Every structure is written in structure tokens, then in C-alpha cells.
Amino acid sequence: MKKIILICIIYTGVVINAFSTDFVTYQLPNGLTVYLWEDHNQPSVYGSVVFRAGSVDEPKEFTGLAHYLEHVLFKGTQKIGALDWQKEKVHYDNIISLYDEYAETTDPQKRTELEKKINEESIEAAKYSFTNEFSNLVQSIGGDGLNAGTSYDQTVYYNNFPAFQLEKWLDLYAERFESPVFRTFQAELENVFEEYNMYEDMNMTHIRKFLFSYLYAGHPYSREIIGAYEHLKNPRLSKLIEFYNTWYVPNNMALILVGNFKTEDAIPLIEAKFSHLERKTLPERPVYTEADFSNNPKFSAKLGYSPMVLLGYKTVPIKHEDTYLLDFCANLLTNSMQTGLLDKITMEGEVQYAGATLDSRRDQGRFLIQAVPYYDVNQRLYESDKATEKIIMHEIEKLKQGNIDDWLIESVKSSMLRQNELMIENARSKAGLLQTIFVYQLPENYYRSLADKIKAVTKDDIQRITQQYLTGNHLTISIETGKPKKNKLTKPDIKPVEQPQGTQSEYATRFKSIPVIDVKSVYNDFNEVKHADLYKGVRLHYTVNPLNDYFSLTLRYGVGTEKMPMLEYAVQLMNSAGIMPVDDAQTVRRRFSELNASCTFSVTDDYLYINLIGSEEKLEEICRLMTRLTLLPKLDDKQKDRIIGTEISYRLMTETKDANVLGNALLDYVRYKDKSDYIDRMTLTEIFGLKISELTGEIIRATDYELDIHYVGKKSFKEVVKLLGENLPLKEGVKTTESPFVKECVTYDKPTIYFLPNKEVQQAQLYFYFNGKPYSIDQEVDYNAFVEYFSGSFNGLVMQEIREKNSMAYTASAGFRKPPLPGKNTYFLGYIGTQSDKAADAIDIFMRLLNNMPQYQERIGDIKMYLKQAYLSGKPSFRNKSRIFDDWLKLGYTDDPAKVHMDKIDNLQFSDIIEFYEQNVKNQNVAIVIMGDPKIIDLKRIETSYGKITKLSTGKLFSKE
């Protein structure tokens, strides 16, 4: 506290409040709110700027402005990216005027002419700017994770960066919001349209639209954040500028820093960089009427792959004093420990799924319950919505009558307290907490006081809250199976925007001259993890927990579904298993909750996992309970039927319709042919015939394999070795693991094209694949340098050529996938999601990048800086340290990869990237994989350019049932 007082004395221009030892918050005279949370367990700093403005603040005639603004605030300012602002401004002003005229014009021919004029002005303006300079500068300081997000009540911009680059990061972000220029607006609109297309192909988008239109009727919360279709097609740049000038002001803005920095270093820099931003009077927000739920309105729509029932109750805004109690009640219904009332009816097979959540926002709130009716595997029919709703209402009534056990209340208390404590182990989660405090104007001690409030919750509180908010009128939404109607967008006739290369703004020159502190590199020390062999093939990995009193314990058995396919279903049952002879699932969940612990089972192709987390003082009891569960599982036939029903209904009703599943199945087929996960799997007949005895035996057999135990906690190494050795289900003479299993990828001996016709999708999915060479850590820097140049974030060629220059896609990516073991092959995978009428153009651009890669030598300095800082900042959290060290050892590292590769990074030349490209990428036999509408995609042009197209059907991609 003395340090904080001293800072107050020195920096009298700011008002500082340190309500706890966790973080410091203060305001600059212009109203900018600052949150600083030092955490020297973090390897870097997470920085964000958040605005208390989102889609609710848009004029109803111009929805989508907040989201548009998020996109174009990456395009620079009158300084960042400006090569000659005065010359550029002439064209920029013309573009603004043309968009105003465009918005007032309804004649299609006139609108086409205006689009052409805007395109011409954009091309001219681009001659005097370098649009991706901002992202290049972030890369030049070793920044990563650059992104932004828009929601109803807020918009946030963020990335990670090394602590010694603090001054540069602050300088860059202060300038970012000073005088932004919304460059290449026309091209970026196309990228937003592609984002819209992507969401249109997701069924949950249409379900959410339908739900929110009634749930928040009469409020902007009822509309989509991305904006209405008609508004997306009729943009107005002047309105975007007006929105920015209104809401993006310092007194509506917060700067958040979390991580490995010093508060006393940050405060004077923040004052110097951000104090000049001009404070403005904010408009008064309108007050909206609540939706009318009188007479229990019911609505239905045919939008889903399977039926669903949604119940909505009116509650309160997030700032209301009842919010935490409503959240507590939601946890009484469903929670991570599966002890809730709705968890119970799910585990008992009364429904396929049921869950509750609290949706609290600035102006209003809703309590939501979602349920999927029970699926009868014999009749292959769902239970009725009416019967499902009756089951749900019965559980809600228990809360209202206080008909709940005391242990459940205590279980929820311990779970919520534990989750809150674990959440602040992560820098981004901490920033999220501060962001919530700012956006919703919560008390600064909100999260600390929340713990005391949770501890004090009584059964009377629960009855009062549920009788007040979950009684009487509510909204019921029934989702039935059916196809949503989609809005079709067409490709505009606009030319690519070319930008100068090999140059930079005066700002960039000054920015790069800002001095940085010469810091000593700190590397990972493998000795921070201790090891002990408890038996042959049973190895303990021990890491100290420096933060709190919650241990984590992971048991990783050396076998997975690749060798034992039934484990997929056995593991699901283990998460709702009892213990023989008499303990049912709910009793087991209760016992874990009474020990303040959670226990979950999971499985991958390679490993079976048992994950425990809980109070350190109860470690021995928790381990004993888990051991009994593992050795004596009591699996239930009704649960088995529910799990089988979920799998059968998914395969019959969802997987051949869902665009993302189809895309994954198509890609899996191209990579693995008949060894695809969607083909080489248990059939429905086999699944339907599964017996409890088989599934129980599968779990027991899986625990016969080699075992790695990863413990993170505060007990001494010696104590842990003894305690775990005596209380875990350990075996002598375990089987040698064959994991990790690396599936053999197909190598194509000539260029190949596969096409899956799908007239239902709005967006074509394009993949580019070829098998690579055996991997060695000696080539690690070569792989990473090439990928950073070719497709690294916003700076890579893929995003620049596909998205920024040609407006082909919202999502475009590429890179090499590396195996978990040396000597196994890598493979290359590229992806573009684009409108079907752009597919042929997008393929041409990507193939040109692969076979005739542009060379911008000036990027090598930024790439080296990024790689260097990425390695140095690549320190695993204490929770994951032992597992990541183990993975590194498997690859052949005997020391921190950063230390191993630093000399090679320092000596990296652009010619090394070109050499890697020519040896590993150029003129490879690429498999081009396409899914989209055959009536719109120019297949003839693609076939003429790249060879014969092999047409596939969905039946080829999935196992025969």
C-alpha cells in the first residue's frame, strides 16, 4: 500500500484507488479509466482497450455500425499507415460523399455506377497509404493474439506483448484511437459480408435470431450484432464516423493491462500517451420497454437439426443486487460438477439434455432454460415438447418451494468460489473481469465482495428469488426440425486495392526509434518439474502451485479410441457413473462436491484422462473416492440409452446437414481416405448393441496401460509421492503404450480436386492440402518463419491477398501441421471460407501464393522479432507446465525450445524463408477440396485451370450404418 500512496503523491494528475492488493484503478483528467493488474507469473502483458459502446447504441436504421467500426479500426490513422495524408484525404472525403449518395439511391444501375466510382477512389486513395502497417507494428514488438470483439454493450481491442515493449504498445494504441482513417472501407464491407455468410451457415445463428427477437422484443438486444441484411447492403461511412466520434471518447473508454509489468513504470507512460484524448459529453441512452410475456406466449420455428425447448423469464440488469442470486439459482439447476436439479434429470435419462443460464446485460436480463427432449432409441422418436416442459417445470418448482437439499446449496457455493479463484490464474480472464466491471459500472470490489455474498446465500434467498422471477409469465420457444431461410449475397464487380510495398509512414519510423529496455532472457527450466517412478510405467510429474490452495491432478493412461473405440461411449458413462454396489451417480457427484472437488473423464485418439481439481487439504479423500469410482464403476442402462440416443440422433439428423461437420468429414476423407474418423468408426448397429458389461470392461482394460500422473499443488514432493502411491488406482506390470498415434496421411502423386455439392450452404469451403516431409526440431525455426511470413495473423500473405486486397473471405488460413513425434510427416493445410460465386477467384489467388509466392524482404525484421518474443513468451502456465515439458521431451528437446532456437532466429535471413518455400511448398501436388453450391461455383473454370474434378457424395464420407 505504501507504494500506491507514493504513486499518488508523484502523479497528482490522476486519481488512484487501490481497493485491494490485486489491481490498481484510476482515471485520467479526461475521464479515461485505467486498470493495472501486476501478475509476475505471466510471461508477458495482456493489453486491451474497451469502449462502453456496442450494437445497442446504433441507430435502428443503420445496424451493424459497431461491428463495422471494429473491423476498420485496424486500418490506421492520419499517422499510422499514412504515406501522404493530404493527398489521400481528397479521395477519402470523396468516398464518404459517394457512400452518402449511394445510401440515398435505389436505382440498381445508378448504385452499380456509384460502386464503381467508390472502387476507383479507393484504388487512388490506397496509393498514399499502407493499410496493414498497424498490424505490422504490433508484430514488430513481438505482439501476438491481435484481435477485437463487438457485443451488445461493449467493444474491445486487445493483444499480448512483451513487458519491455510497454511504451511502444501504449504509444501505438493511443495513436490508434486518436484520428482513425477507415481505409479500404468498400473492401472491408465484403469481408463483413463473408462473416455474415459464415454465420448464416450455422443453425444456431437462426435459432438465436428467432429466440432473441421475442426474448428481447422492443429492445436493440433483439437484433443481431453483425447487423440486418438490408443495412449491410446499404452502408454509410459518414454514419460510421459519427458513431465513432460520439462513443469512442476517453470518458467512455478503459485501458487494461494485466501481466508481467510494474505499475510505477506504466502510470507515467499512460498519462503521457493518453491524456491528450479529448473528453466529450456522452448522449443519454434511451430507455426501452420490456417485452410482453403476459399470458405465457409460445412461438415455434422449423430451424433445428433436432427439437429443442427454450424457456425465458424476465430478470434484471447485471448491475442489480439480485444478479448474483439469480446466477446462484442457475447453478442449482446446472453446474460443472453435475450436481444440479437439471443435471440429475439428464443423468437419469428423463431428457437428452437440460441446462439453465443467466443472461445479464446492461439494460435488461433473462433467465434461460434449454432442453432437448428424450430420444427413444428403439422407436427413434423424441418425447413431446409439452412433456419435456412439464419435467423442467417440476424441477423449477422445487427451487420455489425450497425442496432442495442443503448439500446441493453448499455444493454450488464451493463450486462458484473455486471457479472464481481459478479464473484469475489467467491474464485474459483477469482482464475480462476488469472489462466487466468497467462496462457495467460495477463496484471496483465487486468480485472480492461476491465471494462473501455467495458464502452467505440461504435457502430463504433461493425461494425469494425464484418465487419473484421464475413464477408466472414466461416465454416458450419450440424449435422443430427444418431448414432456415437464408439471405443470398452476390459478388460485387470491384477491382483489388493495391498498396505500396517496401515503405512506411513517418509514424512507423518514429515508433521504431522509441528506445526499449535491454532485458535478460528468462528461459523455462525443466528442473521446475520433479519426477518419480511409482512403478515401472507409472510416472509422477510434480509442479508447485504458487497461487492458491486448489490442486489439479491428471491421470493420463496410454491408450485412446484409436485402439479402443468403445472408450468414447464408456467415458461418457463414467461422467455419470455410480459406485458399486449401491451408490448412484447423484450420490457420487454429491460426495465429490462435499469434498470441494470435481472429477471428469475424457478421451482422445491417444489417451484416456481422469482430471481432478479440488481443495488441497482434501487431496487424500478425493483420490480415494476417484479410485473407487474407477475400479468399481456402476454404469446405468438408462444412461447408456441416453448416450446412444444422442449419437444415433446426431448421425441421422445432424452430421450430414451441418456445414461444418460436412467440411470436416470431407477434409478427413481427403487426408485419410477410409481411415477418416467419420468412416473408420463404430457403426450405429454396433453402438446400439453396446452392453454395460462391455463398457465397464473397457474402462478397466484402459487402466492397464502406462500411466503419467501430473500433479500441481502445494504439498511437498515427498508427501505427494507417498500419498498418491497409496491412494490412486495404480497397477504393476502395465502395458507399454503405443501413443501418441500418428495417422498416416495420403500423398497425392498429381494435382487433385475433390468436390462435394451442397446447394444449402451460403459459403463455399475451400481446403488446400498436401503431405509434407518428416519433422525434426532442427527445422522448427524454418517452419515457423515460413508460416509467419505466409499466413501469420493479419500480416501474412494469405490474409493480405485473400482478405485485405481481394475481399474474398472473412476467414483464411494456412500452415503446416506438425506431429507430436520426430520423424513423422508434417502436412500443409490451407482454408478459405467464401461465397460460392467467389470460389474460383479465391482458388486462383491461393494457388498463385503457393506456386509463385510474392517476396517482401522488408518483413524479415518484424518476423524475427515476433519469433524471438513468441518463444520467450511461450512459457506454459504452472497448471500445464509438466504436460508441455513432457511433450517437448517427446519431440527431442532437452532444454527450453527458446534457448535451443535463439541463435538460429538471430541469424535468420529472408533467403532462408525462400529456400524453405522452394523445397517444401512450391509446385507440390496439391489436393484442392471444395464444398459449395454447384449451380454457382464456376466448376468448368476450375477444372480447366487445375484438372479433373472428382465429385463426392455424403455417402462416401461417412460410415455405412
Model-derived regions, located:
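Carboxylate/His-rich catalytic cores and anion/metal-binding grooves
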Residues: 193-200
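Active-site recognition of the HExxH zinc-binding catalytic motif
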Residues: 63-71, 75, 564-572, 784, ...
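Proteolytic maturation boundary segments
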Residues: 19-33, 262-301, 338, 343, ...
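A common structural junction motif
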Residues: 175-182, 274-281, 392-404, 627-637, ...
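Metal-associated gating/positioning segment near the N- to mid-region
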Residues: 60, 72-84
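Sec-dependent N-terminal signal peptides
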Residues: 4-14
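M16 family metallopeptidases and their MPP-like homologs
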Residues: 37, 42-55, 64-65, 82-175, ...
